[in-house]
Amino acid sequence: PEKESAAFFFMFLAFNLFLASWNSKKEIPRYLLAFLAGLSTAAMANIWGAYVYIYLGIAVPSLIAFLIGKVGKKETSTYSIWLFTSFIVIVFISKKFTINEIIHSTYISSSIAVLFIFIMHFILFNTKIKAYLEKGYHSKIPNRATTLIISLIILFILSFVFFGQNFVANELS
C-alpha cells in the first residue's frame, strides 16, 4: 500500500500546526496547536521512516530563529510541547521505538539539543549567572553565541559521559 501519501499528509500537517503554534498570539491555541503538531509528527513516525525530516525541518529553522533573536519563552514552550508530545506518543503509546533508539537517532537528538540550547539561554541570561557573563571579555560576545558555545560544550561532555568516547565521532561519520 501507498504509505507515503498518508505520511506526507501528516508531515505537512505537523509543519503547518507547528508554524501556526509558533505564530499564535494566545496561549491556549498555541499550546493546543503545538500538541497537535506533536501528534502529527508521531503519526508520521508510525507510518513511514522519513519522520526524521520533521524533526530536522523544525530543529534547524528553530535554531536559526534563536541565533537571530526570534526565540523567547513563548517559542520555547511551543517547541518543547511539540517535542515532548511526539516523544511520549512514539515511545510510550505506539511502542514502535524505545527511548534508547530515540536518543541515539542523530536527527531526533539534534531536536533535543536545540531545546537544550533554548533552556540554557534562559538559565544563563535570566538568572544571576547573567551578571558574571556580562563582565570582562564575556561582555564582547553576543548572548546567543555565548549560549550556543556553552551549550555545545556541555552537550559534548554529557554525550561523552553517558554514551562513551566514540559516540560523537560515530554520529558525525
Predicted ranges, named:
Residues 1-5, 49-50:
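Short acidic/glycine- and proline-prone juxtamembrane loop motifs at membrane-interface regions
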Residues 4-7, 130-132:
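Membrane-interface helix-loop junction between the first two transmembrane segments
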Residues 5-16, 34-37, 54-58, 83, ...:
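Alpha-helical transmembrane segments of multi-pass membrane proteins
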Residues 14-32, 41, 60-74:
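Membrane-interface transmembrane helices that cradle and orient dolichyl/undecaprenyl
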Residues 30-38, 53, 82, 109, ...:
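Small-residue packing motifs within transmembrane alpha-helices
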Residues 51-64, 108-114:
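Transmembrane-embedded, aromatic-rich helix segments that form part
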Residues 66, 72-173:
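Transmembrane helical bundles and short interhelical boundary loops of multi-pass, membrane-embedded
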